[in-house]
Amino acid sequence: MKRWAKILLIVIVVVVAIAAAVPLFVDANTFRPAIDRQLSRALGRSVTFGDLRLSVFSRSLVAKDLSVADDPNFSAAPFLTAKEVRIGVSLRPLIFSHEVVLRDFEIESPQIAVIRDASGAWNFSSIGRRAAAGAPGSGGVAEKAASEASQGSAAPLPDFVVDLIAVEDGRVAFSTVPGRGQAIVYDHVNVTARDFAFALRFPFDFSADLPAGGTINVSGHLGPINGGDAAATPAEAQITVKGLDPVAAGFIDPEDGLSLLADLNVHTAFDGQTSTTNGTVHIEHLKLRKDAAAAPKPVDLAYRGTHRVREYSGQIDDATIKVGDAEIHVSGTYHAMAPSASGAPSAANAKGATGTPGAVSLEVPVLNLKLSGQNLPIDELQSLMTAAAVRLPNGSKLKGGVVSLNLVVTGPAKSLVITGPIAVDNTRLVGFDISNKIHGIASLSGVKTGDTSEIQKLRVNVRVTNGGVVANDIYAVIPAMGELNGSGTISATNQLDFNLVAKVSSASGLGKVGVDLFSALNGGSGKKSGVPLRITGTPDEPYITADVGGVFQKTTNPITSLFGKKK
């Protein structure tokens, strides 16, 4: 072996021996108080961990049983726990000067508890607040920081800087106080923040598995950390979500009846108060009601808007809902429902009964939206009709034609009021024979439509609430029956109650005798004033009768004239 090779080998052996021997002469646990102080001061929370050991080769201290205290206003249990954390340190000052210079953190499989209270505040909001006003995590710190935030002054930021903070394979449980149901759990959470400093903007990456198998990936920048409220830290990010089930994820109450699977691609910019977003959403298996079947076709949504976090309010500048070639546009505003003095929700404003900002019910937004669409192909909208459990008689379907609508959607999300005009042109109701549903005097008229009813025109103003549907100013042109005018209601239990007047003089489904009979039974005025019709039953099984009350009290001359005068 050559001389230089021997020297190199000896050097390597010596270095390895020294590295292996250092932990024998350096008690890593002596650095625990210094690290405790640094982390507790930086986070404004009590930070503790168990046994420490030095790993020279990875240039880190390996800590067992990490625990970070929660904000005592939320929970006495820890905010974060982990079996092991690797704390990167600079070895030279550590070994020779016993000085702890932190470089990075790698936390393995932590358990993190994220909690939101009724006002929308988060338990991580107080992270980073200075402990000068009290012990880390004490009420004094929280009260002082909250006071500073309300006065518009910025809390001082910790001088804590590291190259890397990494969370690997974590588990995050989201819950609310007061508690309602089980926590929503996100598994396999991975977070990376590079060049981290409280006072600077830094890049980060986040990924996790969502409940029911979906995934989320976020890349962007955070910072500087807001010293009074970490939840108000400015951020810019690109968010990609695959296979989101919002019911399983806890965003939608199962009792609302809405369910779907969605893929999202969203860009957001948050200045600490307002978030400006735009993006696209691809929706499959959409259900708008509990008793509905899933939409057979996907629905695509493109939107842009703003959201004010503290007030939990925002504006939808434009959202385009696309089903095939049909496009429906939505715009408007929303805000949180404020509780009344009795504790029940009130839509007055975004302040509570006591005037405290943020004392709002975040689960019940109040909407003020406009929904419009012009000349929408009815064939494309069949998918949405399925998702909304729209029932047509005897399982029939609309074929061809277009629909236009201009609706206003207002009120709390759980008790919306939808009003406005709807217009339908040149469609066919396939699979329903009107003539088989007409009873009483009308059945004598000889109406024959077959299993397809043509609807040339339909105009109606609707008002839809939880109590049912009110339809006013109905005007329809159905060639088999003539022109129809009137109004009616559909109850919350799907009971029909419509009163229409049919001008039958031009009805193609009636013979001349039928037209004359209608007219005669109505006192000779059927061709001009029309024949009253009553529709009851359900959308599945409508029952149509001629309203002949009082007809037989009229003169019998029109009836006798129908069959000719006395010879």
Regions found by a protein language model. Name each.
Residues P542-K567:
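Gram-negative outer-membrane assembly/targeting C-terminal domains
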Residues S55-T81, V101-R130, L164-A166, R171, ...:
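Small-residue helix/turn framework positions
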Residues S153-L164, V417:
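N-terminal helix-cap/turn-to-beta initiation motif at the start of protein domains
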Residues V85:
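An amphipathic, basic-hydrophobic helix/alpha-beta surface used to engage anionic
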Residues R129-P158, A353-T354:
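Intrinsically disordered, low-complexity linkers and terminal tails enriched in Pro/Gly
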Residues L43-G50, S259, I455:
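A short, amphipathic edge element
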Residues M1-G44, K566:
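N-terminal type II signal-anchor transmembrane helix
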